[in-house]
Amino acid sequence: MKVNKRTKLYEWQKRNMGIEQVCPRCTKLREMTVEHIIPVHLLQEIGLQEEAMNDEDNFELLCYSCNKFKGGRIDMAHPKTIPLLKKYINSL
């Protein structure tokens, strides 16, 4: 059975959500949302397949406010950003 994007994201959320956690950005205790470290629209623009867009290495948990604030931008200060960009570029 092929696992689609929504199923994989849902399974990841089930494992990592459900209780309030401390948001790594604002350090407040809040319910978390799933954020893509490298935004999906950028992965699509460079021509990566859907599997790369659903790479669990590219997921992080942020509170709703921080997730909305980050939006579709890349946070170059995030410790996973450069390794993920290298990984995805090398896969082209």
Go through each PLM region and give its residues.
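Short cysteine-rich clusters marking metal-coordination/redox-active sites
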Residues: E20-C26, C63
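Short cysteine/histidine-rich metal-coordination sites, predominantly Zn2+-binding motifs
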Residues: I38-I46, H78-K87
